[in-house]
Amino acid sequence: MKNTLRNILLGGLVVAMTASCELNLIPTTDITYEEGTPLLLTERDIAEFQNGVIASYRGLHYGSYYQTVEVMTECFNATIDFGNNYGFVHKLGSGFLASDDYTTGIWQNHYGAIKNYNIALEQCEMVTDEELLPDTDLLKGITLFCRASSYLTLARHFSADYDPATAATELSVPLILVYDQLHKPVRATLQEVYDQIIT
């Protein structure tokens, strides 16, 4: 009995000591983004930004981003062992709503990638070293393509079909061309979105 009581007391002390430790430590090795600070200082920086842009783009072009659309539009017929995978999408039932994970994932992840693209484009404009300009121009071109691709996907999924007669008044998705955490974007017209995609 004495040993049990002593073990409980020691266990309580260990828990109390652990809980009183300072666990809210601030990391000192992270890189924080400060607006206006140049990040593209070497060829390696540009190559790493380019890898990040391409990784963001590649991450948006597989899996549920495309399977959902395929299941909806290609009239796939479920077999007996399909396990109700993409069930609501397959039958377009009342459970498939705008708040469905397949829908919100497309919206969230494309805008997350657009944020990365906008930061990369902002950084490209800050490069003044003549030796880095060719690599910077390549990064800028890749990033503009990736951002246009994301806007095209968003416009196709969350807007009406493009009709030249109504494009100037039909609302589409928000156009965010500069990274600003505090900005509350409004929906742009379909014409504005497609003009941005083309340019």
Language-model segments: which ranges?
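Short coil/linker segments at helix-helix boundaries
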Residues: 134, 157-196
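Conserved, well-structured interaction surfaces
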Residues: 86-158, 188
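A structural signal for short, hydrophobic/glycine-enriched beta-strand patches
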Residues: 39, 43-44, 57-59, 63, ...
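Sec-dependent bacterial lipoprotein signal peptides
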Residues: 1-19
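Secretory-pathway/luminal and periplasmic proteins that interact with or process carbohydrate-rich
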Residues: 58-63, 78, 150-161
